[in-house]
Every structure is written in structure tokens, then in C-alpha cells.
Amino acid sequence: PIEDVVVQTEFSPTLWCVPATIDVAAVEIDLINAADRESRLRLALREYLQGLEEKGQPKIDYVLIDCPPSLGIMTINAFVAAGEGLIPMQAEYYALEGLALLTRSINRIAEIHNPGLDVSMIALTMFDKRTTLAREVESEVRTYFPRATLDTKIPRSVRVAEAPSFGSPVVFWDPRCTGAVAYKQLAREIALRGAPSQAVTEEA
């Protein structure tokens, strides 16, 4: 159960986390022949959120599911559980090809398991406005996903890359660096957009 592993973070009293461990690597194998293997995460989240409501605890506004860079059973579980998809994308050529593949996969998962799923937001990351490639990639993404592509772009930043080695999000470790400022602006933009898709607790 999620309630057995969820922890309150040191960064905010309203920010909770379900941390991953090395044991996650075995999940792909464990779920190969499991019943409802694509829906395990959705069921676990529904149980946890309903439990909070029954106990009269504060409602969780957002559930963010961080996915591995693959289309394995873990990622499929995340898409089946999600109400909408936010895709962070590096402003590079191969990332553009990967975006096309990912969106097709998401559409397929939506058809079979989660009709309410959609790519509602795309965030450009590691963006270097000095390069022609980055600007061309941005133009392509905005052409094909004009409504989903967010205005805020995350620039390349050494401080962002360094922050994990200090065990802290960059917005706490160096809140004034360009990367931290951009991430805070991105969070505001996402919050203002709201969550128009179905809630994770609804039936797909």
C-alpha cells in the first residue's frame, strides 16, 4: 500500500513523496504474468486517495508520477493511472523523434486502458537559445502541439545538474540561479492551467 511507503519531504509540509528503491528494477519481471498488470498503480493510488478522504485528511492537489525513459510496464502503469500527461523534452533532434513515438504510444494506451488520457503539456528542457537547433526544435514542437507546448523553457544550467549531488531540488539549493527561476515559473504556469482531464480516482 502507498500509505506504508509515502514520506513527508523536508522541503515542504504539503509535499509528500513515494521514493523509489533498487527493488523497483524487479517490478517489470514480477508483473509479466500478473493479473491487471497495467492497472496496479491506478488501483493503489485510488485506494490511497480514498483512504485520505475517509480519514478526513487534506486533499492532495496534484499527483506527479515520474516515469523512466522507456515504455515498459512501469511507464504503462503511470499512463493508465494518470489523468493527463506532461512530457519534459530536451530541445534536441532525437528527442523530437522520441516525442512522436511517445505520443503515439500514449494514444494507443488511451484507446485501450484510459480514454481520458491526453498529452496536455510539453515542457522544453535543457534549452540553449543560442543554438539554431534548439530554436528549430521549439518551432517544430509548437507547430505540431501548439496548445500543449508550455511557454516556459528550462535553460541549460550547471546548477540544475549539480543539485541532485547535494540531495536537494535546485529551487532550494540555489533558488536564484536561472534554472531554479525557470522551474518555479514552469510550476506557476502548470498550476494556472489546472487539471482539465479526469481525476486519477475515476474509472477509465
Name every feature range the model reports, one short phrase each.
Residues P1-A204:
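P-loop NTP-binding core
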